[in-house]
Amino acid sequence: MPNDDAYPNGRIFLFYNTGNNNEGQVRKGNGLRQVWYKTSIDNGQIWSEGINITLQVHRPKQPQINPTYNFEEDWRSFANTPGHALQFQNEKYKGRIFVSANHSQGNPKKNFTDYVANGYYTDDHGKIFRISDDVGIAGSNESMAAELSHNKLMMNSRNQRGDIRAKIVSISSNGGATWDTSYFDKTLIDPVNEGSILTIGHKKGKNIIAFCNAANIKRRDTLYYA
């Protein structure tokens, strides 16, 4: 995707979600999360009006609130990444904006296995969004992604179940549309917490990735970075 000619100096995208009840009640079906974005062309001094993209990136079943929110998937809690989205900088998917996310589906389940991580993306500067597949691990939750080399994407997710105290890593070779693999990286120990991942450079044909989290299986302590 080329740069948007209408904004030669670029735009900042701010993705966010709103809700009419707390997460616990939304998870039980007693509330709604909606998904939005705003943009700025002056480095965040002034922002556009919010654009509601709930119908494109979320699957709520709340027709009593909005008759169009009547998806059989019955997603309930929904959250964008606690950190940054990303825009692909190189190769086939250059320009694509990808936002990590997670949602719960249906009634609450034991050990938070109604939650799962996924994402959504746009190839036309926010006109149309598409939902990525869910990652293959129930209980995956807060997530953040970074661009790897050779058209690949890595997403790093929290394990809300808490049974394995390590980060969940998912790899995509098609820009985040689907996932080649999802697994627990037991070298990245974690106390059930969010971690941060960021592409910080490029050297010898490969992207350089920075990672930071609380590297402790019992408490949010022992800051680790690599």
Model-derived regions, located:
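Asp-box/BNR beta-propeller blade signature and adjacent active/binding-site loops
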Residues: 1-226
